């Protein structure tokens, strides 16, 4: 198996890392930088520039240079955040046919996924150049507060870039992995990850625990704002400079896309400089021109002025932090460390606010630009099976279920369900007087259980003699915080139960997971055919059982010829069930039901007569009550999955 790389797909900058042994390595790009600007430029000749080269030509090509596209991914055009960006971005944002927010470049509409795929392709190439081998698998990070559409869109971007995205993980969780892996402190530690990046803000409360020599990372809570980040800080500076220049020169730079692109670059540079100095100059000669000639821009910006411009933005990070602390069920005093992630956390005022809120100095030993990519690389190593001392409480990679009648895989917990989780379903017996059931637990995506990986089996014995479909066997699946799967079966009638514990996720290598997903796709048609055949056989078996039972009770009321025809149809259907011809089974099943109509009529007439006799002449409501009771019983039966557990085979 090839390496699984870790990619931090950022709004402003992106980063790629791998693991060399147990040491993370952030890979330098072709320009020698450890981070790559998430900027993409589409040239007139069709060439696509990504990163620093795209950033350098942005001033002369503003309408075809895309940045901060991550803020559009998975969003609808009508969302207020998108509408806000339309008025700020030099490039065109358009509505797709499905209502999504797309971008328009050189007359072509493009999905944000396609644009992000160009950045991911650059990250992939950076890793391949370093490793000297093809890279096909990656763990990609997303803001913790991303919704399902945004997560799926990010995964699609990976696929477009030629990457098999093994996992989408949250940026704060990845940063916690990077921080906590080399820490030697014993006992459980709770950390807050404050992640203020280029376009999004997240805060997560995470518990790091030592469990039998493993480091366990459990996310207790998360909160954030997917439209708050460095881009907004830059915009405050741009707005300020535009206003000042208009006062001085009477010219509105906001209507000049070339000037705006230069301003964007200057604002970002000034913001960075003010993290280490008290004052900076924004100088843009020949920024524009009017009838009187060229205009030059020269403005002094102090740190104090910048802080006043962005005060409201910094304040917006506080409420999500308080909510996350509350949702985690902890007090501020319980938090051992605060980790800063994202370039904006280098701003002294942000650090000051974090210290004020959490009552402690934030840690400075985590690189805010690289920690997320490093964490993604660590998770990639865990997924590949090369690292077993780390447990990240995340999702189950494959569906979990049990084998039911006909070898069908009945899924209890579907893949990508967040763990810990619980699920229970009621099944019944397949035969009359069945004394025991065998519960076989499988993991995989195939519809037929045999195509999946069997994790274990156990018996539930001592079921009292009763007709098939009568006992109610509750099967429960429970994945706990350790990633351990507990399966139980309980007879609701007697209270008897049995349990088995399975280490669900450690039972598969990543290669097996890949193979199963591939098999599921390749064999989808074959599985569908087998599933349809099993269902036809189960339906036919139910018909046989029903007709045989009715024939025993009411057969003497039929003429000899009619009874013989039904018995002959029963034999034909029993023979058909032995084969694998679905159409033949359905044909014989239909024939049996058609020929059994006379038997049904006799049953109905007999029931009507009995009800009339019981009701009596003086109680006309009794018959209706009897009918209602029958309907109620039927409804209760409908809640039980009928005849779906095999009888245990005694050796």
Swiss-Prot record:
Q: Which residues carry this modification: Phosphothreonine?
A: 200
InterPro entries tied to this protein: ATPase_NBD, Chaperone_DnaK, Heat_shock_70_CS, HSP70_C_sf, HSP70_peptide-bd_sf, Hsp_70_fam
Residue intervals passing through the bilayer:
none
In terms of SUPFAM superfamilies, this protein maps to: Actin-like ATPase domain, Heat shock protein 70kD (HSP70), C-terminal subdomain, Heat shock protein 70kD (HSP70), peptide-binding domain
Compositionally biased residues, Low complexity: 611-636
Q: Does the keyword Phosphoprotein apply?
A: yes
Please state, per the UniProt record, what induces or represses the expression of this protein: By stress conditions e.g. heat shock.
Q: Looking at the record, which segments are called Disordered?
A: 608-651
Q: Which Gene3D superfamilies match?
A: 1.20.1270.10, 3.30.420.40, Actin, Chain A, domain 4, Substrate Binding Domain Of DNAk, Chain A, domain 1
PROSITE patterns for the chain = HSP70_1 (PS00297), HSP70_2 (PS00329), HSP70_3 (PS01036)
Enumerate the CDD domains for this protein: ASKHA_NBD_HSP70_DnaK-like
Sorted keywords for this record are: ATP-binding, Chaperone, Nucleotide-binding, Phosphoprotein, Stress response
Q: Which GO terms describe its molecular function?
A: ATP binding; ATP-dependent protein folding chaperone; unfolded protein binding
Q: What does this protein do?
A: Acts as a chaperone.
State the family it belongs to: Belongs to the heat shock protein 70 family.
What name has this protein been given in UniProt? Chaperone protein DnaK
Q: What is the lineage of its organism?
A: Bacteria, Pseudomonadati, Pseudomonadota, Betaproteobacteria, Burkholderiales
What is this protein's gene name?
A: dnaK
């Amino acid at each position: 198996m090839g390496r699984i790389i870790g990619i931090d797909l950022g709004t402003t900058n992106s980063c790629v890392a791998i693991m060399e042994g147990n040491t993370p390595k952030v890979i330098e790009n072709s320009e020698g930088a450890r981070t790559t600007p998430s900027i993409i430029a589409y040239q007139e000749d069709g060439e696509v520039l990504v990163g620093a080269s795209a950033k350098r030509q942005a001033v002369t090509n503003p309408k075809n240079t895309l940045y901060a596209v991550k803020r559009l991914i998975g969003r609808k055009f009508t969302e207020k955040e998108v509408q806000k960006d339309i008025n700020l971005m030099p490039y065109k944002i358009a509505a797709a046919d499905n209502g999504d927010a797309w971008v328009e470049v050189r007359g072509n509409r493009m999905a944000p996924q396609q644009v992000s795929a160009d950045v991911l392709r650059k990250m992939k190439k950076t890793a391949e150049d370093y490793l000297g081998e093809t890279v096909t698998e990656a763990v990609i990070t997303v803001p913790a507060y991303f919704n399902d559409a945004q997560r799926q869109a990010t995964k699609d971007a990976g696929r477009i870039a030629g990457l098999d995205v093994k996992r989408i993980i949250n940026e704060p969780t990845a940063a916690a992995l990077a921080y906590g892996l080399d820490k030697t402190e014993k006992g459980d530690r709770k950390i807050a990850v404050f992640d203020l990046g280029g376009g999004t803000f997240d805060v997560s409360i995470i518990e790091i625990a030592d469990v039998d020599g493993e480091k366990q990372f459990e996310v207790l809570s998360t909160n954030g704002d997917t439209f708050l980040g460095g881009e907004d800080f830059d915009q405050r500076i741009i707005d300020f400079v535009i206003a000042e220049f208009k006062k001085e020169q009477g010219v509105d730079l906001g209507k000049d896309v070339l000037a705006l692109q230069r301003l964007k670059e200057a604002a970002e540079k000034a913001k960075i400089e003010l993290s280490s100095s008290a004052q900076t100059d924004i100088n843009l000669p020949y920024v524009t021109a009017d009838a009187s000639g060229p205009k030059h821009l020269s403005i002094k910006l102090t740190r104090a002025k910048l802080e006043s411009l962005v005060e409201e933005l910094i304040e917006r990070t506080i409420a999500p932090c308080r909510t996350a602390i509350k949702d985690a069920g902890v007090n501020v005093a319980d938090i051992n460390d605060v980790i800063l992630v994202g370039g904006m956390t280098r701003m002294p005022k942000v650090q000051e606010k974090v210290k004020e809120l959490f009552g402690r100095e934030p840690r400075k030993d985590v690189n805010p630009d690289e920690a997320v990519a490093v964490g993604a690389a660590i998770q990639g190593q865990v997924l590949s099976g090369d690292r077993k001392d780390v447990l990240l409480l995340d999702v189950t990679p494959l569906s979990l279920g049990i084998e039911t009648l006909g070898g069908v895989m009945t899924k209890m917990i579907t893949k990508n369900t967040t763990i810990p989780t619980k699920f229970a379903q009621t099944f019944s017996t397949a035969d009359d007087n069945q004394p025991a059931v065998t519960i076989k637990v499988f993991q995989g995506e195939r519809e037929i259980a045999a195509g999946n990986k069997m994790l274990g089996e156990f018996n539930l014995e001592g079921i009292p003699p009763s007709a098939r479909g009568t006992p109610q066997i509750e099967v429960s699946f429970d994945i706990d915080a350790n990633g351990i799967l507990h399966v139980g079966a309980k007879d609701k009638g007697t209270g008897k139960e049995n349990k088995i514990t399975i280490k669900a996720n450690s039972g598969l290598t990543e290669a097996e997971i890949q193979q199963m997903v591939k098999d599921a796709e390749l064999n989808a048609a074959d599985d569908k055919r087998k599933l349809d055949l099993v269902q036809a056989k189960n339906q036919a078996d139910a018909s046989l059982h029903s007709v045989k039972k009715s024939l025993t009770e009411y057969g003497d009321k039929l003429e000899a010829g009619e009874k013989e025809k039904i018995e002959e149809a029963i034999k034909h259907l029993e023979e058909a069930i032995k084969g694998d011809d679905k159409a033949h089974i359905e044909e014989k099943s239909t024939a049996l039901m058609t020929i059994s109509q006379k038997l049904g009529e006799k049953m109905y007439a007999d029931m009507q007569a009995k009800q009339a006799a019981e009701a009596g002449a003086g109680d006309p409501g009794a018959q209706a009550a009897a009918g209602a009771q029958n309907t109620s019983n039927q409804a209760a039966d409908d809640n039980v999955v009928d005849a779906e557990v095999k009888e245990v085979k005694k050796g």
